[in-house]
């Protein structure tokens, strides 16, 4: 349980920092691959994914004997990818406006939810080895798309910066 709390804190802090890294780095494109380059929903998903992927270097050592590690990790990543836009657009639809505090809370709710699911899935009965292989492939696909969609964003509302109405690196103000 202590490791869960530490993971939530570390991922939250690193995600918060990565929101500003692109600006701090004078718009370094390599830094931009792993940090937020604009204010789109996708870039906010990215700042939750980056520290989670980095944290995998640590939790992989801690959970290396868990049969469910890769399954739990892919579910954790998918929760971030799905829950963030669901909560953001859900509250935006219900209340017809953005609220900066709610936006920030959503980020932390998503981190807490995904890390808690990761922790709990490592406690249940082992999943079939085939599920773990599929999970590894899915993690690699997520990471590949993560990089690709930063370089070549889809012309869709998830990738559109609401401030500049542009996409990807071009969406930076």
Per-region residue spans from a language model:
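C-terminal, well-folded lobe of enzymatic/effector domains
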Residues: 100-173
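N-terminal membrane topogenic signal
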Residues: 1-7
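Small-polar-interrupted transmembrane alpha-helices in polytopic inner-membrane proteins
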Residues: 55-56, 72-89
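Alpha-helical transmembrane segments of multi-pass membrane proteins, especially transporters
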Residues: 7, 72-80, 103, 107, ...
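Alpha-helical transmembrane segments of multi-pass membrane proteins
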Residues: 10-26, 150
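Membrane-interface helix-loop junction between the first two transmembrane segments
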Residues: 20-39
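Short aromatic-rich membrane-water interface segments that cap or initiate transmembrane helices
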Residues: 33-46, 173
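Juxtamembrane "helix-exit" motif on the non-cytosolic side of transmembrane helices
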Residues: 24-25, 61-62, 89-95, 119-125, ...
């Amino acid at each position: 349980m202590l490791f869960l709390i530490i993971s939530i804190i570390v991922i939250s802090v690193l995600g918060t920092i990565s929101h500003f890294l692109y600006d701090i780095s004078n718009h370094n494109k390599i830094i931009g691959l792993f940090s937020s380059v604009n204010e789109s929903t996708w870039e906010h998903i990215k700042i939750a994914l980056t520290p989670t992927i980095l944290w995998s270097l640590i939790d992989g050592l801690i959970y290396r004997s868990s049969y469910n590690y890769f399954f739990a990790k892919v579910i954790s990543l998918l929760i971030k990818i799905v829950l963030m836009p669901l909560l953001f657009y859900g509250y935006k639809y219900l209340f017809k406006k953005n609220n900066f505090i709610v936006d920030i809370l959503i980020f932390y709710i998503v981190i807490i939810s995904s890390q808690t699911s990761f922790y709990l899935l490592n406690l249940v009965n082992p999943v079939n080895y085939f599920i773990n292989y599929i999970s590894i492939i899915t993690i690699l696909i997520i990471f590949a798309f993560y990089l690709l969609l930063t370089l070549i964003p889809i012309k869709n509302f998830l990738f559109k910066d609401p401030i500049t109405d542009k996409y990807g690196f071009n969406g930076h103000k």
